[in-house]
Amino acid sequence: KWYEKNETNDLDFFGYGWDKHVFKGSKIIKVFNKFNLLTKFLAPKFKNYKGSFEGKKIDLLKEYKFSYCIENAKGFKGYITEKIFHCFFALTVPVYLGCPNITDHIPKECFVDMRDFNSVRDIHIFLKNMPNEKFVNYQKSIKNFLHSDKFIPFSNKHYIETLKDNIFV
């Protein structure tokens, strides 16, 4: 919401459902969700909303220096989803909020930690004024992490090995 009011040209957001109103309540009320024209007509209008993206998320992320990366669930130790890794694979610096012990798994030099700021405005100022050298250092740290042993637990190979060892015994 802060970007909508203050810096509309500095944030693009994508996703499903942001262009639709959702009727809540009884089953009778929820029936209106089936009327696409009505849900689109009543939907809130966001200046920053760019629609849903049908291609590969990593290809889209490559077009941006930064991406807000907010987990759907916060406060669960060790809960790290693909969101931050999509940014890493695109060499887009994540602005992260979610796992409280993220730095036990991923080096702090790889992302901007939203918890270090008092407001979205403060984050925006930090990102806007970041020297290119610092941005490049984030990217170098991301590359180093992706090629380190710390990344192994998050790799496809490790996931397959875990399945093989625990399910297909």
Task: Cite the ranges covered by each PLM segment.
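Pol beta-like nucleotidyltransferase catalytic core
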Residues: 1-7, 11-13, 23-54, 58-68, ...
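Acidic/glycine-enriched connector segments
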Residues: 18-20
